[in-house]
Amino acid sequence: MTFLPEPPHVHGAAPSSPTTAVLLCNLGTPDEPTAPALRRYLAEFLSDPRVVEIPRLLWWLILHGIILRVRPKKSAAKYASIWLPEGSPLKAWTVKQGRLLAGYLGQRGHRVAVDCAMRYGSPSVASVLDAMKAAGVTRVLVLPLYPQYSGPTTASVVDAVAAWAQRTRALPELRFVNRYHDDPGYIGALAHSVLDHWRTHGRPDRPCAAAPRGSPSAGMARAQRLDNRMHRTWARTAQIRCSEPNPKPSRAHAP
């Protein structure tokens, strides 16, 4: 195994940048809304055994024989319809989240670097971890941006970090946030986002509906556990909405 080269250590040198960092990891996005870019992105995404749990040979034939020949062009048109001037909406909003979190921590006196990575596409998890390490970071909190734990999402991020760690000699201290679907801060933020919207636009006549992304039927037991966590998240959010008819405004939507 070949390891990445390590920079020479300078004794007594004080770090000029934060040595603790938060790595926000989102699912991923193509680099641009074109068929070639979608083909690269889908090939990486759909080749992950965490995402598609069927025999590898069978899936390889389906993926390369059918999906990557047909889907990129269709998906590119859909991406183009939502593409922002600053790029992919998912990447743009993830970067904005990172900036808000960095500002929130900085205002409270925490000297912490915050950066973002995509599990599939760019910037990759490995490239961002390389940059953090080169900047002198020695402690990293990895935060997959999925409230409910799931193998194709959260565990796949852990896989990417582990793959980077395998080729790195001097590892930083690594910690992972596994799930936060029932964290009081997260639940409160969800509830206040709904309530803030109601204050501005009025309360709708019909009930609110939560529509999480589905799971493959082949893993129904695993999907049921994810579904239960989704229900708990929404039930606790609804409790706050019902118990606070006139709640105080949320604080600037900070993380």
Predicted features and spans:
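Active-site-proximal alpha-helix that buttresses catalytic centers in soluble enzyme cores
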Residues: T2-P255
